[in-house]
C-alpha cells in the first residue's frame, strides 16, 4: 500500500503575490525535503513473530501463488493489483514547466499518487521513464500489466500522448487513461452542462470556439461532439483549424478537422470567436481579450483554463459581458480541477475489474459531477462542485462502475451503491 504523506514582476501591485509565491516556494521545498518525497511503502499486515513471517512470506505465500497460477483472475483477490494504478510519465509536458525530464517530473507524479489515495483510496505508484520513444513506452507499460490494475498516463507531450494511449488501449486489458486529456475534458463538459442550464441554451444549438489544440483541447472537442455539439471551431497558434489546412497540422488535428469547422472558416481567434456562445481556452495567458468577448453571443460562457494565468481574468470577462466564467485556478469560482474526475473514475473501474475506460464511462463521470450541483444551488459562481466536496468521488465511482457493467467491459458485477459506500470509507478527505 502506498501512503500519502521565472521572472517575477515586483511592481507595487504585485508585491503581495510575490510574497505569496516566495512563501509557497519555501514551504513546498521544505515539505518535500523534510519528508524526502510524499510517498512511502507501508505493510497492510504485521510481521512480529515466526507465524506472521510464515504467512506473509515462505512457506505460506506459496498458497496464493498456486491459486493465481491456476486462475490468473485471482490476482485481483490475493494481491495489490486490484487497487493499484501506475502513474506513468516521460516528463515531456509537465503543467506550467514543460519538458523537464523524468527526474524533475517525479514530484508531480508523487503528488498525483497522493491525490488518488486521498480522494478515492486508490493506491498509486509513480513511474518516470527515461525515454521519449513511443515504442519503448508502450512496451514498458505492457510489461507492467501483471502488477497494475490500471495506468494513468501523465504529462506526456502531444502527439505522442495520443499514440501511446491508443496503442495501450488496444494492446492491454486494463484501464488506460490519459488524465491531461480526459480528466480535463470530463470536468469541463460537466461545468458546461450546468452553465447551459443557467443561460437557457442547448448543446445542439451552441457555437463553441476552443483555443489550444494540445491534449486537453482535442479531448474536450471530442467529448463535446459526443454530447451533440456540432458547431465547433478549434484554433491553434496558426489560427482556425480546418480540413485541408496546408500548415501546422498533424494526424490528430487532421482527424478533428473532419468534423469541426464545417464551413472551413479561416482566420485568427479574434475572427472566429465572433458570435460564439462558448469559449474554451487551454492555451496561454491573455489569448482572449475583452474586445473578443464583446463580439461573442449574449450570455457567453468562458472557460479560461491556462495556468497559472488564464486566457482572460474572470472579472474582465464578466465586465465584457460573459455570463459564466470558469478557470483552472482555486482562487476563482468554478475551478476546473481534474481531481473531480480521475480518483472516482479509477475507483469505479478498479472495483469492477474493468478492461478499459470507454466513452460511456467518461460520459457517466460527466453526469455524476454535473448532477452534484443542485438546481436550487446553481448560479454563475457555482456550476462545478468544489474539489474537496466529499460527495464527488463516491458518485463518480458508482456511475462509472455502472457504465462499465452496462457496456460489457466489467469482469465483475458489483452494486454501484456498494462502490459509492466503499469509496466514502476509503477516501481520506471528508473525515472528521
Name what the model sees in each region:
Residues 126, 152-155, 176-179, 210, ...:
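General beta-strand structural signal in soluble alpha/beta enzymes
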Residues 179-180, 199, 304-414:
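Adenosine-phosphate binding glycine-rich loop
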Residues 90-92, 100, 129-130, 155-158, ...:
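Short, ordered loop/turn segments at secondary-structure junctions
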Residues 253-323, 329-331:
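Rossmann-like adenosine-cofactor binding region
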Residues 76-81, 117-118, 143-145, 169-170, ...:
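Solvent-exposed alpha-helices and their adjacent loops that cap or buttress functional pockets
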Residues 95, 100-120, 178, 182, ...:
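Glycine-rich phosphate/diphosphate-binding loop of Rossmann-like nucleotide-binding domains
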Residues 3-176, 403, 407-411, 429-432:
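N-terminal ligand-binding/catalytic initiation module
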Amino acid at each position: 500500500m502506498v501512503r500519502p504523506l521565472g521572472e517575477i514582476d515586483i511592481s507595487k501591485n504585485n508585491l503581495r503575490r510575490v510574497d505569496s509565491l516566495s512563501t509557497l516556494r519555501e514551504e513546498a521545498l521544505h515539505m518535500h525535503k523534510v519528508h524526502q518525497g510524499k510517498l512511502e511503502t507501508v505493510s497492510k499486515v504485521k510481521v512480529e513473530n515466526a507465524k506472521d513471517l510464515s504467512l506473509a512470506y515462505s512457506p505460506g505465500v506459496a498458497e496464493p501463488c498456486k491459486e493465481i497460477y491456476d486462475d490468473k483472475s485471482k490476482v485481483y483477490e490475493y494481491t495489490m493489483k486490484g487497487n493499484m494504478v501506475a502513474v506513468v510519465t516521460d516528463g515531456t509536458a509537465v503543467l506550467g514547466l514543460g519538458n523537464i525530464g523524468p527526474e524533475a517530473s517525479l514530484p508531480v507524479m508523487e503528488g498525483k499518487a497522493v491525490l488518488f489515495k486521498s480522494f478515492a483510496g486508490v493506491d498509486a505508484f509513480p513511474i518516470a521513464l527515461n525515454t521519449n520513444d513511443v515504442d519503448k513506452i508502450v512496451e514498458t507499460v505492457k510489461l507492467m500489466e501483471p502488477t497494475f490494475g490500471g495506468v494513468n498516463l501523465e504529462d506526456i507531450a502531444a502527439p505522442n500522448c495520443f499514440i501511446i494511449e491508443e496503442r495501450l488501449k488496444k494492446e492491454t486489458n486494463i484501464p488506460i487513461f490519459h488524465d491531461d486529456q480526459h480528466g480535463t475534458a470530463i470536468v469541463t463538459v460537466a461545468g458546461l452542462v450546468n452553465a447551459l442550464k443557467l443561460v437557457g441554451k442547448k448543446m445542439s444549438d451552441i457555437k463553441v470556439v476552443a483555443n489550444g489544440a494540445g491534449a486537453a483541447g482535442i479531448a474536450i472537442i471530442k467529448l463535446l461532439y459526443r454530447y451533440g455539439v456540432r458547431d465547433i471551431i478549434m484554433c491553434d497558434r496558426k489560427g482556425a483549424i480546418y480540413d485541408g489546412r496546408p500548415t501546422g497540422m498533424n494526424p490528430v488535428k487532421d482527424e478533428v478537422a473532419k468534423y469541426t469547422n464545417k464551413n472551413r472558416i479561416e482566420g485568427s481567434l479574434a475572427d472566429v470567436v465572433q458570435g460564439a456562445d462558448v469559449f474554451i481556452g487551454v492555451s496561454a495567458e491573455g489569448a482572449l481579450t475583452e474586445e473578443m468577448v464583446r463580439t461573442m453571443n449574449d450570455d457567453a460562457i468562458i472557460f479560461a483554463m491556462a495556468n497559472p494565468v488564464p486566457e482572460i481574468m474572470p472579472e474582465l470577462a464578466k465586465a465584457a459581458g460573459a455570463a459564466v466564467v470558469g478557470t483552472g485556478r482555486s482562487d476563482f469560482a468554478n475551478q476546473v480541477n481534474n481531481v473531480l474526475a480521475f480518483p472516482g473514475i479509477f475507483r469505479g473501474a478498479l472495483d469492477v475489474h474493468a478492461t478499459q475506460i470507454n466513452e460511456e464511462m467518461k460520459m457517466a463521470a460527466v453526469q455524476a459531477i454535473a448532477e452534484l450541483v443542485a438546481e436550487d444551488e446553481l448560479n454563475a459562481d457555482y456550476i462545478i462542485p468544489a474539489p474537496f466536496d466529499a460527495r464527488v468521488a463516491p458518485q463518480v465511482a458508482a456511475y462509472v462502475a455502472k457504465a462499465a457493467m452496462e457496456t460489457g467491459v466489467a469482469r465483475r458485477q458489483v452494486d454501484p451503491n456498494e462502490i459509492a459506500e466503499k469509496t466514502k470509507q476509503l477516501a481520506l478527505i471528508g473525515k472528521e
